[in-house]
């Protein structure tokens, strides 16, 4: 499977953060199809649409979004028979032990605090590429 066939769905309400993520993926050479949802309602609608043309390898999920926040979305994802198998990475500015624990209890696969500078964001994207994609590809064979 080539990297080009990978899809990541990003649930993020902040336009600047979406643009930074898109730029970081491109700049690191991580050629992946990014699908953006602006809130939890849109995320679940995209994922459950019978016309969905992508199959995300990973979901990057912000916690603080309008309409349906990341916690509610995570809970619904993990209760859905098909969607519960997609790894969910919480990607948020919220950094406290109780929230991290709560997200793991709800079924998050990992929790990443958004870096406050672009250099660290590039490191996070490289980690995603190296761990969630290249490692998974080796184990698929």
Model-derived regions, located:
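Short, glycine/charged-rich "phosphate-handling" switch motifs in NTP-dependent
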Residues: 109
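Receiver (REC) domain active-site loop signature in two-component systems and cognate sites
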Residues: 65
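C-terminal output helix
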Residues: 42, 116-127, 135-140
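Conserved acidic segment of CheY-like receiver
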Residues: 5-16, 21-25, 59
């Amino acid at each position: 499977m080539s990297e080009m066939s990978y899809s990541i769905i990003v649930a993020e309400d902040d336009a600047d953060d979406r643009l930074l993520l898109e730029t970081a993926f491109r700049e690191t050479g991580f050629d992946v199809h990014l699908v953006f949802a602006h809130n939890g309602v849109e995320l679940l609608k995209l994922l459950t649409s019978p016309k969905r043309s992508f199959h995300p390898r990973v979901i990057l999920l912000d916690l603080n979004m309008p309409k349906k926040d990341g916690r509610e979305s995570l809970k619904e994802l993990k209760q859905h028979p098909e969607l519960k198998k997609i790894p969910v990475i919480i990607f948020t500015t919220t950094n406290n032990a109780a929230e991290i624990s709560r997200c793991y209890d709800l079924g998050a696969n990992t929790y990443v605090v958004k870096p406050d500078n672009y250099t660290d964001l590039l490191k996070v994207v490289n980690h995603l590429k190296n761990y969630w994609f290249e490692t998974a590809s080796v184990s698929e064979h």
